[in-house]
A protein has these predicted regions:
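N-terminal active-site segment of His-dependent metallophosphoesterases
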Residues: 1-42
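Active-site neighborhood of divalent metal-dependent phosphoester bond hydrolases
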Residues: 39-127
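Acidic, His/Gly-enriched loop-helix segments that form or flank divalent-metal centers
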Residues: 103-200, 207-211, 230-234
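Binuclear metal-dependent phosphoesterase catalytic core
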Residues: 196-250
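SH3/SH3-like (including bacterial SH3b) beta-barrel domains
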Residues: 245-259, 297-322
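SH3/SH3-like beta-barrel fold
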Residues: 273-278, 314, 327-331
Length: 348
C-alpha cells in the first residue's frame, strides 16, 4: 500500500470487501506515499475487526527502528535526503519545523517519535507471519527449511527473490515485498503470480516503488472444498481511445529493470538512443526522455520496455505518458510505445 490510502480504499470497494471477509495486509503500508499517517490510522481501525490481520513489512520495521533506536538517529538525515521523498518521517519533520537546523539528530528523533507515539506503538507490535488453514502469509519469504519460524528476521522481511528460491512446506506461501514485474525478464507486468507447483503466490504490484504500478488484491474462495483464486487491482491511469489504426511489425521484447539500470549509449538518435545493458547483455533502443547521466554514467530512469504496440481505431488504452510523437501505453495488458493518436481522457 505504501501510504496510498486512496488506492487502497478504491481496491477494497472494487472487491466489495465486507467485515465478514478475512482481510490480510502483508506489510509495507507505510512510507513512499503521500498519505502515510492517514493510512496507518485507517489500518489501525481495520485491525480492530476480528477477521483483519496486519503483518509487519520491512518498511514498518525500519520506521520503528529509525525512530526508537538512539544509535540510528544520525541516519534520519540521510533517510530524508536519499531514501524517501515523502512518508511520515518527512511529513512530521516539516510539521514540527525541524528543518531549521537548531536540533541535534537525537532531538529530532525524539520529537518525531513522540509525535508518532501511537502509530509506532501499533506497528512495533505487528506479527511477522500468519498461518491460516493451508496458507502461510509473510511479507518477503521464508528460508528453505521445514522449521520456517526459525528463519531470520531479515529473510522474513527482506528476502529479494523468494519466488526463485522456493520453500519446503506443504502450505501455499503468500508474499509481497518484491514487485512481481521484477520476475518477468522481458515484459512489464504487475499482475499477481500464482504458482501451484511451487506453492508460492506473489502479490506486490509495485505501488509506491515503480512508476508503472498497481495495487493488487488476491481473492481466495473455497467452494465445495476446492480453493479458487482470483485477482483485482487498482491502477489509476487515464483511459484514452485510439483515433486511428497503428500497425507495427512485432519486435523482440527487451526490458530494463531493477537493479540493472546502467546502460552504455552506443548511438544517440533524435528520439531514441541505441543502448547496451551489460548485466543482461541486451541491446535496445531507449526513448531519450528515459535516459539521464550521473557521475559520468548513463542510466535508465525506471523499468522500460522497447516493445512497440499496434492498435485499432476505437481501442481503449491506458496512457502512462506522452513523449514527443510517442505514447507510452498499456494495451490489452501489454506495456509499450506506440505512434498512436489518442482522444481526450475518457471515463471507463
Amino acid at each position: 500500500i505504501h501510504g496510498h490510502l486512496d488506492r487502497f480504499q478504491a481496491l477494497l470497494k472494487k472487491v466489495k470487501y465486507t467485515p465478514e471477509d478475512y482481510l490480510i495486509i502483508l506489510g509495507d503500508f507505510v512510507e513512499k506515499g503521500d498519505q502515510v499517517i492517514e493510512t496507518i490510522h485507517y489500518v489501525q481501525e481495520l485491525s480492530k475487526r476480528d477477521r483483519v490481520f496486519v503483518l509487519m513489512g520491512n518498511c514498518e520495521w525500519a520506521l520503528d527502528a529509525l525512530l526508537t533506536i538512539p544509535e540510528l538517529a544520525n541516519q534520519i538525515q540521510g533517510y530524508l535526503k536519499r531514501v524517501s521523498s515523502n512518508g511520515c518521517i518527512r511529513e512530521v519533520y516539516h510539521r514540527l519545523h525541524l528543518d531549521q537546523g537548531h536540533e541535534t539528530m537525537l532531538g529530532i528523533q525524539k520529537q518525531i517519535a513522540d509525535y508518532l507515539h501511537d502509530e509506532i506503538a501499533f506497528i512495533s507490535h505487528l506479527p511477522v507471519t500468519l498461518k491460516l488453514n493451508q496458507f502461510l502469509f509473510v511479507h518477503a519469504g521464508i528460508e528453505k527449511r521445514k522449521d520456517y519460524k526459525n528463519s531470520s528476521l531479515s529473510s522474513l522481511l527482506e528476502m529479494k527473490y523468494f519466488y526463485h528460491q522456493g520453500h519446503l512446506l506443504d502450505d501455499m506461501v503468500i508474499v509481497g515485498h518484491l514487485p512481481t514485474s521484477n520476475y518477468y525478464p522481458n515484459q512489464i507486468c504487475n499482475d499477481i503470480i500464482i504458482d501451484e507447483k511451487k506453492k508460492i503466490i506473489c502479490i506486490d504490484g509495485g505501488t509506491g516503488v515503480k512508476s508503472i504500478s498497481q495495487l493488487n488484491a488476491l481473492i481466495i474462495e473455497s467452494k465445495d472444498g476446492v480453493i479458487h483464486y482470483s485477482q483485482e487491482y487498482v491502477q489509476p491511469l487515464p483511459y484514452h481511445h485510439v483515433i486511428s489504426d497503428v500497425e507495427i511489425s512485432q519486435n523482440e521484447k527487451h526490458k530494463i529493470a531493477y537493479p540493472h539500470f546502467e546502460v552504455e549509449v552506443i548511438k544517440k538518435g533524435e528520439e531514441f538512443s541505441e543502448c547496451y545493458q551489460k548485466e543482461t547483455q541486451q541491446y535496445l533502443k531507449i526513448k531519450n526522455e528515459f535516459l539521464y547521466k550521473r557521475h559520468h554514467q548513463t542510466y535508465c530512469l525506471d523499468d522500460y520496455t522497447d516493445y512497440f504496440i499496434s492498435a485499432k481505431k476505437g481501442d481503449l488504452v491506458k496512457v502512462i505518458g506522452i513523449y514527443s510523437h510517442y505514447a507510452y501505453v498499456i494495451h490489452q495488458g501489454e506495456v509499450g510505445l506506440s505512434l498512436i493518436h489518442i482522444s481526450e481522457p475518457t471515463r471507463h
